[in-house]
């Protein structure tokens, strides 16, 4: 324990520490309990409980209760008080778990959309070239093929270092991590050293937390301005990305639409030609590393963008282009992200996690590229979240799909009828839309009505296998519902 707090010049008693935890419910004998002041609760209230459970020591937020950097004792248990503990947590946890991030190649990916697919592509692609790869993010954490589901995109600063330590101990040599704006603002990845950091795009999301787009952009920018990274990869097709490139002359500029800045002197990768077909896309590109052609099984223009960004990220780190291109056709779409389900004589069904106006627009545009018949859209909006996006999403569905079915998503504590009414308020002609509250019923209805050459996009839940109604968590999966209707397995 002395080594852990040596940077603060504190004289603390020597104790052997077993684990480091923020959760008093699981704190046990020999642990270091961390008492931070969070958004919802003050962890210092749980110090007595942690002591009762036999923790070896406590580190707590000093603000308002103790001198800025000080040591006290409660019932024989040393309590180290540090001011702004949240800001130091990543460093402390890194020390505690012996700097696991330095033992593997760590890539951080941020942006509103595309984080999950890009991290999965990076992990799959690097593993195909001999790495033992892991992912950390929305779908879960763990080695590829052994991913355990998670609650938050970016865990606490302690969780992240602990997880990295476990991954290194399991043999991981490469990890691709989704980095959320919440995680950046709360310093959860502050002490990590990234081999590369990636920006996908920025659009309306999490405004219930950030308040406005300026704050949201500033949160994302932290990964490129205040965090340590060897390489920076920026999507130049995004307005914010292009603006950032002017401040990042050494970054890799990536575009699928000819948006690499004129006179760009840094590394770059740009698509020349993209052909969409039933089974994915063929992409011809040019770059600082030479030209090539990429065959992909993923759907939609934004997945072309995700692929190019992932490719550039691996090229700039020295992975050989020929091997990357040979592995590309074997890359799999992410579970519940533009995931395609087919059956003879049935419509093509695409399950996607799109739950923002921008993501829904992109998902519909993507499905349209591969659609020869009518395009159907089944979606809803979550309760107790940004209400401003509901009419926007209704308008987008009406504009871009031929047939729309509005249904429930995760209503939470709100009345499902009120959420649907908000969505319908954004339509020019609500009479063109079917509203079916039961989600399984809505999905079934759309698939039964659709013809063989139609495409049915089911948006909003993606990989989720539950539905939040009131305070209940019900078993429900779009993927399982679709697979049953098409006579297959999800």
Swiss-Prot record:
Keyword terms of this UniProt record: ATP-binding, Cell cycle, Cell division, Cell shape, Cell wall biogenesis/degradation, Cytoplasm, Ligase, Magnesium, Nucleotide-binding, Peptidoglycan synthesis
Query: What does the entry list as the binding residues for UDP-N-acetyl-alpha-D-muramoyl-L-alanyl-D-glutamate?
Result: 22, 24, 39-41, 152-154, 180, 186, 188
Check the record and name the InterPro entries matching this protein: Mur-like_cat_sf (IPR036565), Mur_ligase_C (IPR004101), Mur_ligase_C_dom_sf (IPR036615), Mur_ligase_cen (IPR013221), Mur_ligase_N (IPR000713), MurE/MurF_N (IPR035911), UDP-N-AcMur-Glu-dNH2Pim_ligase (IPR005761)
Which Gene Ontology terms describe the biological processes this protein takes part in? Answer: cell division; cell wall organization; peptidoglycan biosynthetic process; regulation of cell shape
Per the UniProt record, which EC number(s) apply here? 6.3.2.13
HAMAP family recorded = MurE
The identity of this protein, by name, is UDP-N-acetylmuramoyl-L-alanyl-D-glutamate--2,6-diaminopimelate ligase
**Lineage per the UniProt record:** Bacteria, Pseudomonadati, Pseudomonadota, Gammaproteobacteria, Enterobacterales
């Amino acid at each position: 324990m002395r080594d852990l707090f040596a940077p603060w010049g504190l004289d603390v008693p020597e104790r052997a520490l077993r684990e480091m935890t923020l959760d008093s419910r699981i704190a046990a004998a020999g642990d270091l309990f961390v008492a931070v002041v969070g958004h919802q609760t003050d962890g210092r209230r749980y110090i007595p409980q942690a002591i009762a459970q036999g923790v070896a020591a406590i580190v707590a937020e000093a603000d308002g209760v103790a001198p800025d950097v000080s040591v006290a004792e409660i019932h024989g248990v040393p309590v180290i008080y540090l001011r702004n503990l949240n800001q130091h947590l990543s460093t402390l946890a890194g020390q505690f778990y012996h700097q696991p991030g330095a033992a593997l190649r760590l890539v951080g990916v941020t942006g509103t959309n595309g984080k999950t697919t890009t991290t999965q592509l990076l992990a799959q692609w690097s593993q195909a070239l001999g790495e033992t790869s892991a992912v950390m993010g929305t779908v879960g954490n763990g080695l590829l093929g052994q991913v355990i589901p998670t609650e938050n995109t970016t865990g606490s600063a302690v969780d992240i270092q602990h997880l990295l330590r476990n991954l290194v101990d399991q043999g991981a040599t490469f990890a691709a991590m989704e980095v959320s704006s919440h995680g950046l603002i709360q310093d959860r990845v502050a002490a990590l050293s990234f081999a590369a950091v990636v920006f996908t795009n920025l659009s309306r999301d999490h405004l219930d937390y950030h308040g406005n787009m300026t704050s949201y952009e500033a949160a994302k920018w932290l990964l490129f301005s205040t965090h340590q990274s060897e390489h920076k990869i920026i999507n130049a097709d995004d307005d914010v990305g292009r603006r950032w490139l002017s401040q990042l002359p050494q970054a890799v500029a990536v575009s699928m639409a000819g948006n690499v800045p004129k006179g760009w002197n840094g590394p770059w990768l740009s698509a020349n030609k993209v052909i969409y077909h039933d089974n994915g896309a063929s992409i011809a590109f040019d770059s600082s590393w030479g030209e090539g052609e990429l065959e992909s099984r993923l759907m939609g223009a934004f997945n072309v963008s995700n692929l190019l960004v992932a490719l550039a990220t691996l090229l700039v780190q020295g992975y050989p282009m020929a091997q990357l291109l040979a592995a590309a056709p074997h890359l799999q779409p992410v579970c519940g992200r533009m995931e395609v389900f087919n059956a003879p004589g049935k419509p093509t069904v695409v399950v996607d996690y799109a739950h923002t106006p921008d993501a829904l627009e992109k998902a519909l545009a993507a499905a349209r590229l591969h659609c020869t018949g009518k395009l159907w859209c089944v979606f809803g909006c979550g309760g107790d979240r940004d209400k401003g996006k509901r009419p926007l999403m209704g308008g987008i569905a009406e504009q871009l799909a031929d047939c729309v079915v509005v249904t429930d998503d995760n209503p939470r504590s709100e009345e499902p009828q009120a959420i649907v009414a908000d969505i319908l308020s954004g339509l020019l002609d609500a009479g063109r839309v079917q509203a079916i509250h039961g989600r399984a019923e809505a999905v079934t209805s759309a698939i039964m009505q659709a013809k063989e050459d139609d495409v049915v996009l089911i948006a909003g839940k993606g990989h989720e296998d539950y539905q939040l109604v009131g305070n209940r968590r019900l078993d429900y999966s779009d993927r399982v519902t679709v697979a049953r209707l098409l006579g297959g397995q999800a």
